[in-house]
Protein backbone atom coordinates (compact mmCIF):
# COMPACT_ATOMS: atom_id res chain seq x y z
CA UNK A 1 0.00 0.00 0.00
CA UNK A 2 1.36 3.41 -1.00
CA UNK A 3 1.44 6.30 1.44
CA UNK A 4 0.24 9.78 0.45
CA UNK A 5 1.76 11.79 3.29
CA UNK A 6 4.14 14.44 1.98
CA UNK A 7 3.55 13.44 -1.65
CA UNK A 8 2.96 16.21 -4.19
CA UNK A 9 -0.26 15.49 -6.08
CA UNK A 10 -1.37 17.38 -9.19
CA UNK A 11 -5.13 17.42 -9.82
CA UNK A 12 -6.75 19.01 -12.87
CA UNK A 13 -10.44 19.86 -12.87
CA UNK A 14 -10.24 20.45 -9.12
CA UNK A 15 -12.92 23.13 -8.98
CA UNK A 16 -15.79 20.71 -8.42
CA UNK A 17 -16.94 17.11 -8.59
CA UNK A 18 -14.43 14.28 -8.51
CA UNK A 19 -11.49 16.70 -8.70
CA UNK A 20 -12.55 18.55 -5.56
CA UNK A 21 -13.31 15.29 -3.77
CA UNK A 22 -9.86 13.95 -4.68
CA UNK A 23 -8.25 17.13 -3.36
CA UNK A 24 -10.04 16.85 -0.02
CA UNK A 25 -9.42 13.12 0.30
CA UNK A 26 -5.69 13.62 -0.31
CA UNK A 27 -5.66 16.61 2.04
CA UNK A 28 -6.84 14.33 4.82
CA UNK A 29 -3.93 12.03 3.95
CA UNK A 30 -1.49 14.96 4.29
CA UNK A 31 -0.53 15.22 0.63
CA UNK A 32 0.65 18.51 -0.89
CA UNK A 33 -1.63 19.71 -3.68
CA UNK A 34 -1.21 21.47 -7.03
CA UNK A 35 -4.78 22.20 -8.14
CA UNK A 36 -6.11 23.66 -11.37
CA UNK A 37 -9.37 24.38 -13.17
CA UNK A 38 -10.88 26.82 -15.66
CA UNK A 39 -13.51 27.66 -13.03
CA UNK A 40 -11.60 30.02 -10.76
CA UNK A 41 -14.48 30.47 -8.29
CA UNK A 42 -14.89 26.73 -7.85
CA UNK A 43 -11.14 26.31 -7.61
CA UNK A 44 -10.90 28.96 -4.90
CA UNK A 45 -13.53 27.11 -2.87
CA UNK A 46 -11.63 23.85 -3.19
CA UNK A 47 -8.45 25.59 -2.05
CA UNK A 48 -10.20 26.98 1.04
CA UNK A 49 -11.60 23.57 1.93
CA UNK A 50 -8.24 21.84 1.43
CA UNK A 51 -6.37 24.44 3.46
CA UNK A 52 -8.92 24.07 6.25
CA UNK A 53 -7.80 20.44 6.40
CA UNK A 54 -4.19 21.55 6.73
CA UNK A 55 -3.03 20.98 3.16
CA UNK A 56 -0.29 22.95 1.44
CA UNK A 57 -1.89 24.11 -1.81
CA UNK A 58 -0.77 25.78 -5.03
CA UNK A 59 -3.60 26.67 -7.41
CA UNK A 60 -3.73 27.95 -10.99
CA UNK A 61 -6.36 28.63 -13.61
CA UNK A 62 -5.68 26.12 -16.39
CA UNK A 63 -7.33 24.98 -19.60
CA UNK A 64 -5.83 21.53 -20.13
CA UNK A 65 -6.43 21.78 -23.88
CA UNK A 66 -3.83 24.57 -24.07
CA UNK A 67 -0.57 22.64 -24.32
CA UNK A 68 1.85 25.49 -23.67
CA UNK A 69 -0.15 26.50 -20.60
CA UNK A 70 0.03 22.94 -19.26
CA UNK A 71 3.79 22.80 -19.83
CA UNK A 72 4.20 26.12 -18.03
CA UNK A 73 1.98 24.85 -15.21
CA UNK A 74 4.23 21.80 -14.77
CA UNK A 75 7.31 24.01 -14.56
CA UNK A 76 5.60 26.26 -12.00
CA UNK A 77 4.50 23.34 -9.85
CA UNK A 78 7.99 21.83 -9.79
CA UNK A 79 9.50 25.24 -9.03
CA UNK A 80 7.08 25.61 -6.11
CA UNK A 81 7.24 22.13 -4.56
CA UNK A 82 10.55 20.83 -5.91
CA UNK A 83 9.03 17.60 -7.22
CA UNK A 84 5.83 15.87 -8.34
CA UNK A 85 4.82 12.36 -7.30
CA UNK A 86 1.25 11.92 -8.51
CA UNK A 87 -0.79 13.37 -11.38
CA UNK A 88 -4.57 13.02 -11.57
CA UNK A 89 -5.61 14.00 -15.10
CA UNK A 90 -9.24 14.53 -14.17
CA UNK A 91 -10.44 17.63 -16.07
CA UNK A 92 -13.14 16.92 -18.62
CA UNK A 93 -16.28 18.12 -20.33
CA UNK A 94 -19.35 16.41 -21.77
CA UNK A 95 -21.24 16.63 -25.05
CA UNK A 96 -24.36 14.94 -26.37
CA UNK A 97 -25.16 14.60 -30.05
CA UNK A 98 -25.34 12.02 -32.82
CA UNK A 99 -22.60 12.12 -35.45
CA UNK A 100 -24.89 13.42 -38.20
CA UNK A 101 -26.04 16.32 -36.01
CA UNK A 102 -22.64 17.25 -34.57
CA UNK A 103 -20.38 19.99 -35.91
CA UNK A 104 -16.68 19.31 -36.36
CA UNK A 105 -15.92 22.02 -33.79
CA UNK A 106 -18.01 20.25 -31.14
CA UNK A 107 -16.21 16.95 -31.67
CA UNK A 108 -12.82 18.67 -31.75
CA UNK A 109 -13.48 20.46 -28.46
CA UNK A 110 -14.31 17.19 -26.68
CA UNK A 111 -11.18 15.53 -28.06
CA UNK A 112 -9.05 18.57 -27.18
CA UNK A 113 -10.14 18.62 -23.53
CA UNK A 114 -10.96 15.01 -22.69
CA UNK A 115 -8.16 13.30 -24.64
CA UNK A 116 -5.47 15.87 -25.43
CA UNK A 117 -5.88 17.31 -21.94
CA UNK A 118 -4.83 13.93 -20.55
CA UNK A 119 -1.95 13.66 -23.02
CA UNK A 120 -0.80 17.20 -22.24
CA UNK A 121 -0.86 16.58 -18.50
CA UNK A 122 0.91 13.25 -18.81
CA UNK A 123 3.64 14.52 -21.12
CA UNK A 124 4.22 17.70 -19.10
CA UNK A 125 4.60 15.96 -15.76
CA UNK A 126 5.96 12.50 -16.66
CA UNK A 127 9.68 13.41 -16.52
CA UNK A 128 9.17 14.87 -13.04
CA UNK A 129 7.09 11.89 -11.90
CA UNK A 130 9.83 9.53 -13.08
CA UNK A 131 12.49 11.64 -11.34
CA UNK A 132 10.54 11.50 -8.06
CA UNK A 133 11.43 7.82 -7.72
CA UNK A 134 7.93 6.96 -6.51
CA UNK A 135 5.46 8.20 -9.10
CA UNK A 136 1.90 7.57 -10.19
CA UNK A 137 -0.10 8.77 -13.21
CA UNK A 138 -3.89 8.51 -12.81
CA UNK A 139 -5.96 9.18 -15.92
CA UNK A 140 -9.73 9.50 -15.73
CA UNK A 141 -11.55 7.71 -18.53
CA UNK A 142 -15.22 6.76 -18.07
CA UNK A 143 -17.78 3.99 -18.13
CA UNK A 144 -18.03 5.23 -21.73
CA UNK A 145 -14.42 4.22 -22.21
CA UNK A 146 -15.62 0.63 -21.73
CA UNK A 147 -18.71 0.66 -23.95
CA UNK A 148 -20.00 2.93 -26.71
CA UNK A 149 -23.42 4.58 -26.46
CA UNK A 150 -25.57 6.39 -29.06
CA UNK A 151 -25.31 10.16 -28.78
CA UNK A 152 -21.90 9.90 -27.12
CA UNK A 153 -19.69 9.22 -30.15
CA UNK A 154 -17.35 12.16 -29.50
CA UNK A 155 -17.17 11.49 -25.76
CA UNK A 156 -16.71 7.76 -26.41
CA UNK A 157 -13.87 8.50 -28.83
CA UNK A 158 -12.07 10.63 -26.24
CA UNK A 159 -12.56 8.23 -23.34
CA UNK A 160 -11.63 5.11 -25.34
CA UNK A 161 -8.51 7.00 -26.43
CA UNK A 162 -7.67 7.80 -22.81
CA UNK A 163 -8.00 4.13 -21.97
CA UNK A 164 -5.70 3.00 -24.78
CA UNK A 165 -3.17 5.73 -24.08
CA UNK A 166 -3.09 4.92 -20.37
CA UNK A 167 -2.85 1.16 -20.74
CA UNK A 168 0.02 1.54 -23.22
CA UNK A 169 1.75 4.04 -20.91
CA UNK A 170 1.56 1.58 -18.04
CA UNK A 171 3.27 -1.09 -20.14
CA UNK A 172 5.94 1.38 -21.26
CA UNK A 173 6.74 2.17 -17.63
CA UNK A 174 6.99 -1.55 -16.87
CA UNK A 175 9.25 -2.24 -19.86
CA UNK A 176 11.53 0.69 -19.03
CA UNK A 177 11.42 -0.21 -15.31
CA UNK A 178 10.61 3.35 -14.40
CA UNK A 179 9.38 3.85 -10.81
CA UNK A 180 5.96 4.95 -12.00
CA UNK A 181 2.62 3.22 -11.55
CA UNK A 182 -0.20 4.01 -13.98
CA UNK A 183 -3.93 3.73 -13.33
CA UNK A 184 -6.89 4.17 -15.67
CA UNK A 185 -10.15 5.11 -13.93
CA UNK A 186 -13.63 4.34 -15.30
CA UNK A 187 -16.31 6.13 -13.25
CA UNK A 188 -19.97 5.29 -13.71
CA UNK A 189 -22.71 7.79 -12.92
CA UNK A 190 -21.30 10.40 -10.54
CA UNK A 191 -23.27 13.35 -9.14
CA UNK A 192 -21.29 16.22 -10.64
CA UNK A 193 -22.03 19.30 -12.74
CA UNK A 194 -20.65 17.71 -15.92
CA UNK A 195 -24.06 16.92 -17.46
CA UNK A 196 -25.51 20.30 -16.47
CA UNK A 197 -22.54 22.04 -18.10
CA UNK A 198 -22.57 19.81 -21.19
CA UNK A 199 -23.02 21.17 -24.67
CA UNK A 200 -25.38 19.47 -27.10
CA UNK A 201 -25.85 19.28 -30.86
CA UNK A 202 -28.18 21.76 -32.56
CA UNK A 203 -31.77 20.67 -32.06
CA UNK A 204 -31.00 18.69 -28.92
CA UNK A 205 -32.56 19.62 -25.56
CA UNK A 206 -29.73 20.24 -23.11
CA UNK A 207 -32.05 20.52 -20.11
CA UNK A 208 -33.70 17.17 -20.84
CA UNK A 209 -30.28 15.53 -21.17
CA UNK A 210 -29.01 17.04 -17.92
CA UNK A 211 -32.16 16.29 -15.92
CA UNK A 212 -32.27 12.69 -17.12
CA UNK A 213 -28.62 12.16 -16.22
CA UNK A 214 -29.02 13.69 -12.77
CA UNK A 215 -32.24 11.79 -12.02
CA UNK A 216 -31.50 8.36 -13.50
CA UNK A 217 -27.76 7.96 -14.03
CA UNK A 218 -25.97 9.98 -11.34
CA UNK A 219 -25.92 7.28 -8.68
CA UNK A 220 -22.77 8.01 -6.68
CA UNK A 221 -21.28 10.94 -4.81
CA UNK A 222 -17.94 12.46 -5.87
CA UNK A 223 -16.66 11.55 -2.40
CA UNK A 224 -17.42 7.88 -3.01
CA UNK A 225 -15.67 8.08 -6.37
CA UNK A 226 -12.61 9.77 -4.87
CA UNK A 227 -12.37 7.20 -2.08
CA UNK A 228 -12.52 4.36 -4.61
CA UNK A 229 -9.89 6.01 -6.81
CA UNK A 230 -7.50 6.76 -3.95
CA UNK A 231 -7.86 3.21 -2.61
CA UNK A 232 -7.04 1.88 -6.07
CA UNK A 233 -4.02 4.15 -6.34
CA UNK A 234 -2.80 3.02 -2.91
CA UNK A 235 -2.98 -0.58 -4.11
CA UNK A 236 -1.30 0.19 -7.43
CA UNK A 237 -4.26 -1.05 -9.46
CA UNK A 238 -3.98 -0.78 -13.24
CA UNK A 239 -7.73 -0.22 -13.62
CA UNK A 240 -10.27 1.27 -11.22
CA UNK A 241 -13.95 0.91 -12.11
CA UNK A 242 -16.20 3.12 -9.97
CA UNK A 243 -19.73 1.95 -9.18
CA UNK A 244 -21.55 -1.36 -9.38
CA UNK A 245 -23.29 -0.36 -12.61
CA UNK A 246 -19.94 0.39 -14.24
CA UNK A 247 -18.56 -2.96 -13.08
CA UNK A 248 -21.67 -4.73 -14.43
CA UNK A 249 -21.31 -3.00 -17.80
CA UNK A 250 -17.62 -3.90 -17.92
CA UNK A 251 -18.45 -7.57 -17.37
CA UNK A 252 -21.32 -7.41 -19.87
CA UNK A 253 -19.09 -6.00 -22.59
CA UNK A 254 -16.45 -8.65 -21.94
CA UNK A 255 -18.98 -11.50 -22.11
CA UNK A 256 -21.06 -10.27 -25.05
CA UNK A 257 -18.31 -8.84 -27.20
CA UNK A 258 -19.58 -6.60 -30.00
CA UNK A 259 -23.11 -7.99 -29.64
CA UNK A 260 -23.58 -5.69 -26.61
CA UNK A 261 -24.15 -2.90 -29.13
CA UNK A 262 -27.62 -4.11 -30.14
CA UNK A 263 -28.64 -4.42 -26.50
CA UNK A 264 -27.42 -0.92 -25.66
CA UNK A 265 -29.01 0.58 -28.78
CA UNK A 266 -32.37 -0.96 -27.90
CA UNK A 267 -32.16 0.30 -24.33
CA UNK A 268 -31.21 3.81 -25.38
CA UNK A 269 -34.03 3.97 -27.93
CA UNK A 270 -36.53 2.96 -25.25
CA UNK A 271 -35.35 4.88 -22.19
CA UNK A 272 -33.29 7.88 -23.36
CA UNK A 273 -35.76 10.57 -24.49
CA UNK A 274 -33.23 12.66 -26.42
CA UNK A 275 -31.74 9.83 -28.49
CA UNK A 276 -34.41 9.39 -31.16
UniProtKB/Swiss-Prot annotation:
One of its GO terms (biological process) is biological process involved in interaction with host. SUPFAM superfamilies: NAD(P)-binding Rossmann-fold domains. Its EC number is 1.-.-.-. It comes from the Bacteria. It holds the Pfam family adh_short. Gene3D superfamilies: NAD(P)-binding Rossmann-like Domain. One of its GO terms (molecular function) is oxidoreductase activity. Required for maintaining the appropriate mycolic acid composition and permeability of the envelope on its exposure to acidic pH. Belongs to the short-chain dehydrogenases/reductases (SDR) family. This is Putative oxidoreductase SadH. It comes from Mycobacterium tuberculosis (strain ATCC 25618 / H37Rv). The lineage of its organism: Bacteria, Bacillati, Actinomycetota, Actinomycetes, Mycobacteriales. The gene is sadH.
Amino acid sequence: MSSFEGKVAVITGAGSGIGRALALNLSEKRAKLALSDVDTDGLAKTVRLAQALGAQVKSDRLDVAEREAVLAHADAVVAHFGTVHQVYNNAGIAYNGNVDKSEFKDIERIIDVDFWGVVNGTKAFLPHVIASGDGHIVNISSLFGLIAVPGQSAYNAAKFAVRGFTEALRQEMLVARHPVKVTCVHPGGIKTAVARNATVADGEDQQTFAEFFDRRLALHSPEMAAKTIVNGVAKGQARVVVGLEAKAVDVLARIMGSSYQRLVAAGVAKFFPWAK
